[in-house]
Amino acid sequence: MPVTDLSELDTKKLYSYADYLLWRMKERIELIRGKVFKMSPAPGTEHQRISHELDRQLGNYFYRKPCQVFPAPFDVRLPGPAAKGDEGIFTVVQPDLCVVCDTVKLDEKGCKGAPDFVIEILSPGNSKKEMRDKYEVYEEAGVREYWLVNPSEKAVFIYLLSKEGRFIGLQPLTEDQVAKAHIFPGLEIALNELFNPVG
């Protein structure tokens, strides 16, 4: 019998992507190191507006370029170094937006391996543990650039992967500044327009 409700899962157990594929729940969930995290049932209006605007701007920038943009829901499987098959994958996340340049990582299920660029938009339902764990798994997997957008603070936090494989946090950007992607020259987002739409 497939699992249809989150209450049917043992919160002390570690689950794999093979388990995840058998679930038929209404709730959206992510696996982080085998632990189940329930996602917000439906993102709020501000979250969706920001997500749509970022998706539009990324789509314009990557038009006719080899990299591809994927908005949530889109499964990103982050296998560990020794992972073999779906049973060996214990992290499956759905970033708000991600950019994948290596098309070998793409299959009918989503992306297997680290996207080049990930954007997460904070929602009131995000726990500190969830955000800390995501930061760590993105770093370990080798995401080259990670943006954390905080709508309530009207700020963007940018993390770049160093040659040593560690994230380096840049100075936080506020609504009167421009966020510039470091791995994609020319990709710039005016935060005033992102956080304070006209019309």
Regions found by a protein language model. Name each.
Residues 1-199:
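Gly/Pro/Ser/Thr-rich low-complexity, intrinsically disordered segments predominantly at protein N-termini
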